[in-house]
Amino acid sequence: LLIGATPVFWAVDPSYIQIIIPTTVLSILALRFYTPPPKLYLVDVADAAGLALFAILGAQKALSYQLIEPVAVIMGVITGIAGGMIRDVLTPTTPFVMRSEMYALAAIIGVVVYTLVRSYIPETAAMITGMLAIFSLRVAAIYWQIQVPIIKFKDKT
């Protein structure tokens, strides 16, 4: 909507809904019957995959509207993070983006990788490369508790 892409792509192409609904059902079933390893939960892995997919799709959409790469990076990051925030609002959890593990930074790095390599390799390969970068960084950040430094401001009182 920010770039004038109307109607919203997932409202016209049923393939997105056809992927989202079974994935949601499988995630619910998996969480019910699966005992995750102590440091990495299935919801974290699914969130990393969703962040990777939607960040790259958002950047690709921006580039398809002839927007410049820095804007595509911003749009990709917004798209990737917004989906996770909507999910977090609907569930009683602390939003992943508000936790200290690398989240937005993983999306930024992965989308930058995608925009840099897409001129040199086929589009699908560039998308997969960007998604793998985001997914790998996010999962590594969760598993090894890699944190982004928090900027603290002095209290003026």
For every predicted segment, state its role.
Residues 53-57, 109-115:
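Hydrophobic, membrane-inserted alpha-helices
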Residues 127-140:
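Small-residue-rich transmembrane alpha-helices that serve as helix-helix interface/gating elements
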Residues 25, 29, 61, 81, ...:
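Alpha-helical transmembrane segments of multipass membrane proteins
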Residues 2-12, 57-71, 116-126:
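Helix-coil boundary and interhelical linker segments in multi-pass alpha-helical membrane proteins
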Residues 13-20, 38-50, 75, 97-105, ...:
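Cytoplasmic-side transmembrane-helix entry/capping segments in multi-pass membrane proteins
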Residues 8-22, 68-80:
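Structural signature of hydrophobic alpha-helical transmembrane segments
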